[in-house]
Amino acid sequence: LCKARMFSDTLSKIHFWGWQLIIVAAAVTLPLGLTQGAEYAELIWPIDLAITIIWVVFGWNMFGTIIKRREKHLYVAIWFYIATFVTVAVLHIVRSGQLPYSFLHSYSWYSGVQDALVQWWYGHNAVAFFLTTPYLGLMYYFMPKAANRPVYSYRLSIIHFWALIFLYIWAGPHHLLYTAL
């Protein structure tokens, strides 16, 4: 997409090994019952902090690569990857806002109805923007290459991108239908 090597091999290694440590930490703490008790946001605050740091490393490397690219055209696919980084960062920071009271425990910034709304805004969009937008970006690059044809309509792909960004992110409350809220 960028016709350039990754911005930094060191950042790539930190990103890779950081995720491995996060996975191991989650695999150890979750069975021990050390959780926040929120679906899709179970991990305790030190692991959430590590996720934030590793996500910033990922973004730094991605944006560095985009900046040093040799391809003049910025493919729509890259827009979807940028949206993934920005949206997941905002989602994670807002949902994982905690007030630590010990090394392993914390209080959420939210309670009651606000907690439920923030939880499902996060739960819905963490899946949507962590899984769906990178896949769409991949398809916007791969399908035209595989078909050996350009994207049917660049304008339509731009409309698709902005519609996804401005409309899909607010769909989380449907997880609360038929609940006490």
State the predicted function of each range.
Residues 4-20, 73-82, 148-164:
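Membrane-interfacial loop-to-transmembrane alpha-helix junctions, especially the N-terminal start
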Residues 1-2, 58-64, 133-147:
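Transmembrane alpha-helical segments in integral membrane proteins
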Residues 132, 150-181:
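Membrane-embedded translocation segments of transport machinery
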Residues 19-23, 81-85, 89, 125, ...:
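Alpha-helical transmembrane spans of integral membrane proteins, capturing the lipid-embedded, hydrophobic core
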Residues 40-49, 112-128:
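Short aromatic-rich membrane-water interface segments that cap or initiate transmembrane helices
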Residues 1-73, 96, 100-108, 168-181:
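Membrane-interface helix-loop-helix modules in multi-pass inner-membrane proteins
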Residues 71-78, 85-122, 134-135, 139-143:
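Juxtamembrane/interfacial segments at transmembrane-helix boundaries in multi-pass membrane proteins
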